[in-house]
Protein backbone atom coordinates (compact mmCIF):
# COMPACT_ATOMS: atom_id res chain seq x y z
CA UNK A 1 0.00 0.00 0.00
CA UNK A 2 2.91 2.37 0.68
CA UNK A 3 4.14 1.73 -2.85
CA UNK A 4 0.74 2.55 -4.33
CA UNK A 5 0.65 5.84 -2.44
CA UNK A 6 4.19 6.72 -3.57
CA UNK A 7 3.46 5.78 -7.18
CA UNK A 8 0.29 7.86 -7.23
CA UNK A 9 2.26 10.81 -5.98
CA UNK A 10 5.23 10.58 -8.37
CA UNK A 11 4.37 8.63 -11.54
CA UNK A 12 2.75 10.78 -14.27
CA UNK A 13 0.99 7.83 -15.93
CA UNK A 14 -0.41 6.37 -12.72
CA UNK A 15 -4.07 5.28 -12.82
CA UNK A 16 -5.37 7.05 -9.74
CA UNK A 17 -8.87 5.61 -9.99
CA UNK A 18 -7.56 2.04 -10.05
CA UNK A 19 -5.03 2.91 -7.35
CA UNK A 20 -7.70 4.18 -5.00
CA UNK A 21 -9.86 1.13 -5.70
CA UNK A 22 -6.96 -1.12 -4.75
CA UNK A 23 -6.29 0.79 -1.54
CA UNK A 24 -9.97 0.48 -0.64
CA UNK A 25 -9.91 -3.24 -1.43
CA UNK A 26 -6.96 -3.68 0.92
CA UNK A 27 -8.90 -1.88 3.63
CA UNK A 28 -6.26 0.43 5.07
CA UNK A 29 -7.69 3.82 6.12
CA UNK A 30 -4.24 5.33 6.63
CA UNK A 31 -3.30 4.80 2.98
CA UNK A 32 -6.62 6.10 1.66
CA UNK A 33 -6.06 9.21 3.79
CA UNK A 34 -2.47 9.61 2.53
CA UNK A 35 -3.58 9.26 -1.08
CA UNK A 36 -6.11 12.04 -0.56
CA UNK A 37 -3.46 14.21 1.05
CA UNK A 38 -0.73 13.73 -1.60
CA UNK A 39 -2.23 12.75 -4.94
CA UNK A 40 -2.96 15.53 -7.41
CA UNK A 41 -5.75 13.46 -8.97
CA UNK A 42 -7.98 12.06 -6.24
CA UNK A 43 -11.68 11.24 -6.03
CA UNK A 44 -12.48 12.82 -2.67
CA UNK A 45 -16.10 11.65 -2.62
CA UNK A 46 -15.07 8.03 -3.12
CA UNK A 47 -12.24 8.44 -0.66
CA UNK A 48 -14.56 9.79 2.02
CA UNK A 49 -17.07 7.02 1.36
CA UNK A 50 -14.29 4.47 1.87
CA UNK A 51 -13.04 6.07 5.08
CA UNK A 52 -16.57 6.29 6.39
CA UNK A 53 -17.17 2.60 5.69
CA UNK A 54 -13.87 1.62 7.32
CA UNK A 55 -14.99 3.44 10.46
CA UNK A 56 -11.62 4.71 11.69
CA UNK A 57 -12.30 8.07 13.42
CA UNK A 58 -8.65 9.15 13.40
CA UNK A 59 -8.38 9.16 9.61
CA UNK A 60 -11.80 10.72 9.10
CA UNK A 61 -10.58 13.53 11.35
CA UNK A 62 -7.24 13.78 9.52
CA UNK A 63 -8.95 13.85 6.12
CA UNK A 64 -11.20 16.67 7.30
CA UNK A 65 -8.11 18.63 8.29
CA UNK A 66 -5.78 17.97 5.35
CA UNK A 67 -7.81 17.05 2.28
CA UNK A 68 -8.51 19.83 -0.22
CA UNK A 69 -12.11 18.66 -0.50
CA UNK A 70 -14.06 17.14 2.36
CA UNK A 71 -17.72 17.00 3.35
CA UNK A 72 -17.35 18.19 6.93
CA UNK A 73 -21.05 17.92 7.70
CA UNK A 74 -21.07 14.25 6.76
CA UNK A 75 -17.67 13.78 8.39
CA UNK A 76 -18.88 15.13 11.72
CA UNK A 77 -22.00 12.97 11.57
CA UNK A 78 -19.83 9.91 10.99
CA UNK A 79 -17.61 10.78 13.97
CA UNK A 80 -20.77 11.13 16.05
CA UNK A 81 -22.03 7.75 14.82
CA UNK A 82 -18.69 6.23 15.83
CA UNK A 83 -19.17 7.73 19.33
CA UNK A 84 -15.61 8.99 19.55
CA UNK A 85 -15.46 12.19 21.66
CA UNK A 86 -11.70 12.60 21.20
CA UNK A 87 -11.87 13.08 17.46
CA UNK A 88 -15.05 15.15 17.66
CA UNK A 89 -13.04 17.47 19.91
CA UNK A 90 -10.01 17.41 17.58
CA UNK A 91 -12.22 18.18 14.59
CA UNK A 92 -13.50 21.25 16.44
CA UNK A 93 -9.91 22.41 16.79
CA UNK A 94 -8.77 21.91 13.22
CA UNK A 95 -11.65 21.73 10.73
CA UNK A 96 -12.89 24.77 8.86
CA UNK A 97 -16.63 25.31 8.69
CA UNK A 98 -17.22 23.27 11.84
CA UNK A 99 -20.69 22.93 13.40
CA UNK A 100 -19.83 23.58 17.04
CA UNK A 101 -23.43 23.37 18.22
CA UNK A 102 -23.99 19.94 16.71
CA UNK A 103 -20.65 18.72 18.03
CA UNK A 104 -21.37 20.05 21.52
CA UNK A 105 -24.70 18.23 21.64
CA UNK A 106 -22.90 15.06 20.61
CA UNK A 107 -20.39 15.42 23.44
CA UNK A 108 -23.27 15.92 25.87
CA UNK A 109 -25.07 12.85 24.53
CA UNK A 110 -21.90 10.81 24.89
CA UNK A 111 -21.59 12.02 28.49
CA UNK A 112 -17.85 12.56 28.27
CA UNK A 113 -17.03 15.34 30.72
CA UNK A 114 -13.33 15.25 29.85
CA UNK A 115 -13.91 16.38 26.27
CA UNK A 116 -16.66 18.81 27.28
CA UNK A 117 -13.98 20.42 29.43
CA UNK A 118 -11.43 20.41 26.60
CA UNK A 119 -13.96 21.87 24.17
CA UNK A 120 -14.75 24.70 26.57
CA UNK A 121 -11.06 25.39 27.00
CA UNK A 122 -10.04 25.31 23.34
CA UNK A 123 -12.90 25.60 20.83
CA UNK A 124 -13.51 28.93 19.11
CA UNK A 125 -17.23 28.62 19.87
CA UNK A 126 -18.70 27.01 22.97
CA UNK A 127 -21.96 27.24 24.93
CA UNK A 128 -20.51 27.90 28.38
CA UNK A 129 -23.85 27.99 30.18
CA UNK A 130 -24.98 24.62 28.84
CA UNK A 131 -21.45 23.27 29.14
CA UNK A 132 -21.28 24.24 32.79
CA UNK A 133 -24.65 22.59 33.46
CA UNK A 134 -23.20 19.34 32.11
CA UNK A 135 -19.88 19.76 33.89
CA UNK A 136 -21.48 20.33 37.26
CA UNK A 137 -23.22 16.93 37.10
CA UNK A 138 -19.91 15.07 37.20
CA UNK A 139 -18.22 13.45 40.16
CA UNK A 140 -14.82 14.00 38.50
CA UNK A 141 -13.70 17.10 40.38
CA UNK A 142 -10.49 17.38 38.38
CA UNK A 143 -12.43 18.75 35.40
CA UNK A 144 -14.51 21.13 37.50
CA UNK A 145 -11.28 22.60 38.87
CA UNK A 146 -9.55 22.75 35.48
CA UNK A 147 -12.54 24.39 33.81
CA UNK A 148 -12.38 27.12 36.44
CA UNK A 149 -8.79 27.71 35.41
CA UNK A 150 -9.36 27.82 31.65
CA UNK A 151 -12.97 28.50 30.64
CA UNK A 152 -13.73 32.09 29.65
CA UNK A 153 -17.04 32.01 31.53
CA UNK A 154 -17.46 30.02 34.72
CA UNK A 155 -19.75 29.91 37.76
CA UNK A 156 -17.24 29.63 40.58
CA UNK A 157 -19.84 29.62 43.36
CA UNK A 158 -21.75 26.61 41.99
CA UNK A 159 -18.49 24.86 41.17
CA UNK A 160 -17.14 25.39 44.69
CA UNK A 161 -20.32 24.03 46.24
CA UNK A 162 -19.99 20.98 44.03
CA UNK A 163 -16.42 20.41 45.17
CA UNK A 164 -17.50 20.81 48.80
CA UNK A 165 -20.27 18.24 48.25
CA UNK A 166 -17.63 15.63 47.39
CA UNK A 167 -15.84 15.92 50.71
CA UNK A 168 -13.05 13.40 50.10
CA UNK A 169 -12.81 13.35 46.30
CA UNK A 170 -12.94 17.14 46.15
CA UNK A 171 -10.30 17.75 48.82
CA UNK A 172 -7.29 17.79 46.48
CA UNK A 173 -9.02 20.09 44.00
CA UNK A 174 -10.24 22.51 46.66
CA UNK A 175 -6.65 22.75 47.83
CA UNK A 176 -5.44 23.42 44.30
CA UNK A 177 -8.12 26.08 43.88
CA UNK A 178 -6.68 28.02 46.81
CA UNK A 179 -3.28 27.92 45.11
CA UNK A 180 -4.55 29.08 41.69
CA UNK A 181 -4.80 32.84 41.21
CA UNK A 182 -8.02 32.85 39.18
CA UNK A 183 -9.82 30.54 41.59
CA UNK A 184 -8.45 32.36 44.63
CA UNK A 185 -9.57 35.78 43.37
CA UNK A 186 -13.03 34.48 42.44
CA UNK A 187 -13.52 32.83 45.82
CA UNK A 188 -12.37 35.96 47.62
CA UNK A 189 -15.01 38.01 45.79
CA UNK A 190 -17.69 35.43 46.58
CA UNK A 191 -16.85 35.35 50.28
CA UNK A 192 -16.56 39.14 50.50
CA UNK A 193 -20.10 39.43 49.12
CA UNK A 194 -21.38 36.82 51.56
CA UNK A 195 -19.77 38.62 54.49
CA UNK A 196 -21.24 41.94 53.36
CA UNK A 197 -24.70 40.38 53.23
CA UNK A 198 -24.27 38.89 56.69
CA UNK A 199 -23.06 42.23 57.99
CA UNK A 200 -26.06 44.01 56.51
CA UNK A 201 -28.42 41.59 58.24
CA UNK A 202 -26.85 41.99 61.68
Feature names for model-found ranges:
Residues 1-202:
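Ankyrin repeat (ANK) tandem alpha-helical domains that serve as protein-protein interaction scaffolds
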Amino acid sequence: SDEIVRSGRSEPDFDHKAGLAELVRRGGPRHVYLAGAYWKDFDYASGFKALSAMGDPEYIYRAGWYWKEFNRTAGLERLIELKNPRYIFYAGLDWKGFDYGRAFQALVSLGDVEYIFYAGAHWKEFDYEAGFDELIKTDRMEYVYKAGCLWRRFDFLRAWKRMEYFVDDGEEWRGRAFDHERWRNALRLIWDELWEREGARS
